[in-house]
Amino acid sequence: MSEQEVLQKNNSPEGKEDRIIGKHVFGNLYDIDAERLNDKEFLEKLVLEAVNIAHMKLVEIKAWSFGGKKGGVSVIALVEESHIALHTWNEYNYATLDVYTCGEDSDPQSAFAHIVNALNPKRYQMFYADRSSQ
């Protein structure tokens, strides 16, 4: 057996391979009501709801408002499984959303869908990347 094969084997009784499960859902949201995109408290509550819906465990959440041209709100939720990041630009009616989780039990797609449904963009793009170790 090669060294590489040894490293890929798991010594668990089930014989399952030992690996990291990484699920990354991210996207761009267009043509959103500017008032919603500038409401820091609403957006922070929305991200907290998404954490719970996706079966994540919150470590800390922070939200910031940015004024001036290209201003908006950023909300970052650090979760045991990884993070949710929401960034808005109210002048452009635009937001980006990033939901990354590790582990089999979390559901980043449900968190993404919850935030998209609440913000109600006229259109959006969603992307998925498998960030697993194998």
UniProtKB/Swiss-Prot annotation:
Top-level EC class as recorded in UniProt: lyase
Classification via Pfam families: AdoMet_dc
Cofactor note text: Binds 1 pyruvoyl group covalently per subunit.
Sorted UniProt keywords: Autocatalytic cleavage, Decarboxylase, Lyase, Polyamine biosynthesis, Pyruvate, Schiff base, Zymogen
GO MF term set: arginine decarboxylase activity
SUPFAM superfamilies with a match to the protein in the record: S-adenosylmethionine decarboxylase
Protein name, entry field: Arginine decarboxylase proenzyme
Organism: Saccharolobus islandicus (strain L.S.2.15 / Lassen #1) (Sulfolobus islandicus)
Phylogenetic lineage: Archaea, Thermoproteota, Thermoprotei, Sulfolobales, Sulfolobaceae
